[in-house]
């Protein structure tokens, strides 16, 4: 089957690789000059299935009000003048109940765990290198309230059989030796030994090369203008004056997926702006060995070979790509507070990206009401974590195979409404 994939971020490239491995003739189209040059370029570098959780959580609405008055707040909201933003935030608020949080987190952990398994199999098969580490993830708590609040996440981890360790301040140095110097600032930590890290942009670039060796064609610097429709199906992709035709089409355009298919269906994928800095390591003993999550500031600090990546925060501000100095100050403050002297933040590069987020946190992967149109978008802050599993799942669906995990509640159908305004039963 001929398949066209729109988008060459980590999700689009992973989709291309698994489809090519399944025997399909694949073409990837992107407006950029190469793979992973937008949202996948400088993310936090974590592959953290156990920490796959929606931003829509109990207590977040009240926290959001408090964060409005804090300098280093992890969440910021500025109205972008669109009705869509207001609708999206309303849907997100509706998902901030304990019941919906548990359902949404369960879906996310299921896909993320499967995705890590797919990544490990890919690594074993190909030997792909991307400055990866398998040292686990450590969530750090600065208050007793945060430590007590971890109970709901631990319950989900136990239900999903995800290994974890609850650490006292004195035990944190066993996972991250450099934290010994700042353990007095912390009340404990939750460690997931099965989590991994790696440079997402490097991984995507090398996976694209592997995909090319399987026959995938990459068309960069190519405008993606519109989908041509005929007879209720997609008849091609309009790229400037050219129409590219295939048997099946995959939209993996991140935050831009919403507007691109708006004439066909409405999907609630909104850009959630995040930031990162990448600093050179100057003192190995003071640097992290894997990755930590600062629960207070919602910031991840990740070790690459000779660099530290510090990323996080969320701004609901539309398609604004402005680099804000105050956000850099927060990232530098966090890493220098936990790992003083480990990296030289004065020489750090500063980046921002738009994560494609759904109100419930779960991505949209699978079939659509248009028979030859498939979606792979809405992964939010977890595109790197979920990329391989999403690509394999999509390849199975397009190939007519039964996916290895439950996929019916991951598709767009959970958001589509029937004439009575009720959500239709979800199916893949």
Curated annotation (Swiss-Prot):
Required cofactor names: FAD
Coiled coil spans: none
Record flagged with keyword Zinc-finger: no
Pathways per UniProt: Amino-acid degradation; D-alanine degradation; NH(3) and pyruvate from D-alanine: step 1/1
Binding, FAD: 3-17
Keyword Flavoprotein: yes
GO cellular component: cytoplasm; plasma membrane
Record-level Gene Ontology MF annotations: D-amino-acid dehydrogenase activity
Catalyzed reactions per annotation: a D-alpha-amino acid + A + H2O = a 2-oxocarboxylate + AH2 + NH4(+)
The organism's place on the tree of life at top rank: Bacteria
Function, as annotated: Oxidative deamination of D-amino acids.
HAMAP family documented for this protein: DadA
Protein name: D-amino acid dehydrogenase
Lineage of producing organism: Bacteria, Pseudomonadati, Pseudomonadota, Betaproteobacteria, Burkholderiales
